[in-house]
Amino acid sequence: MLRNTLKCAQLSSKYGFKTTTRTFMTTQPQLNVTDAPPVLFTVQDTARVITLNRPKKLNALNAEMSESMFKTLNEYAKSDTTNLVILKSSNRPRSFCAGGDVATVAIFNFNKEFAKSIKFFTDEYSLNFQIATYLKPIVTFMDGITMGGGVGLSIHTPFRIATENTKWAMPEMDIGFFPDVGSTFALPRIVTLANSNSQMALYLCLTGEVVTGADAYMLGLASHYVSSENLDALQKRLGEISPPFNNDPQSAYFFGMVNESIDEFVSPLPKDYVFKYSNEKLNVIEACFNLSKNGTIEDIMNNLRQYEGSAEGKAFAQEIKTKLLTKSPSSLQIALRLVQENSRDHIESAIKRDLYTAANMCMNQDSLVEFSEATKHKLIDKQRVPYPWTKKEQLFVSQLTSITSPKPSLPMSLLRNTSNVTWTQYPYHSKYQLPTEQEIAAYIEKRTNDDTGAKVTEREVLNHFANVIPSRRGKLGIQSLCKIVCERKCEEVNDGLRWK
């Protein structure tokens, strides 16, 4: 606490703003009220706190929750007294948000109430797009299960806080759906390792792999790692900061202040922590899920089947292939198509494509998918065995296009938010998370020139990313990540590094 108080004074001096460490105003949600609304909106000085409050459903999002958050965020965007937004759960550390309430959607579909299903996804995806283009800082506490719709609430925010309780996944392949909520836009851009052609992004989308908070941080799925017990103090701290220049919470300068405030509460990774993916496993993912070389799921399966490498690599490839065989064949193909399209599109178009896909899968006019049936099997009937897929044929390109495209007979659009912008790259994500392999490659290649003999050492790479870039100076785990990249992707030539 003394360390944090001293840092507050340092930040006050650096940025020229005042902090209030004793007299902050806050309203706390009454979580013991049984009829409390599913989303709570409270005040923490100049911050606004949105608390998901549907614990019995692990905060699974329904239309009411998405709609209320969307409307309130629009009001916060216009408010002169709101500097930033904190998004968290009343159910932590068990869950942040376990996903969208697709069980209810499946019931709508069986009852032919497709308008209700489409409204559900319109509300949810409009919220995702709003968060992705929000002009004030949003800080998300991913303390607990963060899956599906929970990923949609967090992945688009520049400040994504993982904890020791985080369990991150996109498990939609198990219910015959697809990795939605803009995840196929986000993951190709922010994942740090084995992702030069969206390989790790595609792997996570197709396998539904669950990763811990520490792994989520190392992979770039989270921007910071903070112990769960420090989140309340962090919330108070965030409510104390205000932008110094023209009181503009949309300025890049204020985003930097938010980042430095979060950095004060960052926790070390667990002492026994070992990154989930060894170099051999990263090599498998990189080789077998390359978007530029794989046009179909069958290509990926063949790559896994024929993988040549170490014994560890071959075993991992076989493990992945076995896992993929339990997933919905049609969903795998749709997911691949969406990663291909959304990895090169802008955020608004990508989330609209998710909306078209969700609506078409709900209506299922051509009987190409098994979303409703598989969702009922797993989430309503609570069957523990995988759903017995019957739609196993390879879809034609025209069928995939039809599923992921709008229908003239079914007009739909995202709700209009206050930002009225879109972009192909997030403006702040790369500044505050660990660097990607592509960033490290660009630096090494820029510093290396065989004609002039210019070279760069591993030590210089580590120093550049850990000390030279202000927003990443001393960042947790940055040296470990750079070492992984240098060891796996570089070769030593004349006492320097060359990118392979």
From Swiss-Prot:
GO cellular component, one term: mitochondrial inner membrane
GO MF terms held by the record: 3-hydroxyisobutyryl-CoA hydrolase activity; structural constituent of ribosome
Enzyme's top EC category: hydrolase
Binding site for substrate: E124, G149, E172, D180
Subcellular location: Mitochondrion
Subunit structure and binding partners: Component of the mitochondrial small ribosomal subunit (mt-SSU). Mature yeast 74S mitochondrial ribosomes consist of a small (37S) and a large (54S) subunit. The 37S small subunit contains a 15S ribosomal RNA (15S mt-rRNA) and 34 different proteins. The 54S large subunit contains a 21S rRNA (21S mt-rRNA) and 46 different proteins. mS47 forms a protuberance of the yeast mitoribosome and retains a solvent-exposed cavity likely capable of accommodating a substrate, in accordance with it being an active enzyme as well as an integral constituent of the mitoribosome.
Cysteines joined through disulfide linkages: none
Keywords carried by this UniProt record: Branched-chain amino acid catabolism, Hydrolase, Mitochondrion, Phosphoprotein, Ribonucleoprotein, Ribosomal protein
Catalytic activity field: 3-hydroxy-2-methylpropanoyl-CoA + H2O = 3-hydroxy-2-methylpropanoate + CoA + H(+)
Keyword Phosphoprotein: yes
Encoding gene, per UniProt annotation: EHD3
One biological process term in Gene Ontology: valine catabolic process
Family per similarity comment: Belongs to the enoyl-CoA hydratase/isomerase family. Mitochondrion-specific ribosomal protein mS47 subfamily.
Note: Present with 3950 molecules/cell in log phase SD medium.
Organism: Saccharomyces cerevisiae (strain ATCC 204508 / S288c) (Baker's yeast)
Function field: Component of the mitochondrial ribosome (mitoribosome), a dedicated translation machinery responsible for the synthesis of mitochondrial genome-encoded proteins, including at least some of the essential transmembrane subunits of the mitochondrial respiratory chain. The mitoribosomes are attached to the mitochondrial inner membrane and translation products are cotranslationally integrated into the membrane. mS47 has enzymatic activity in vitro, and is able to catalyze the specific hydrolysis of 3-hydroxyisobutyryl-CoA (HIBYL-CoA).
Main location: mitochondrion
Protein name, as recorded: Small ribosomal subunit protein mS47
Keyword Ribosomal protein: yes
Residues with Phosphothreonine modification: T326
Enzyme Commission designation: 3.1.2.4
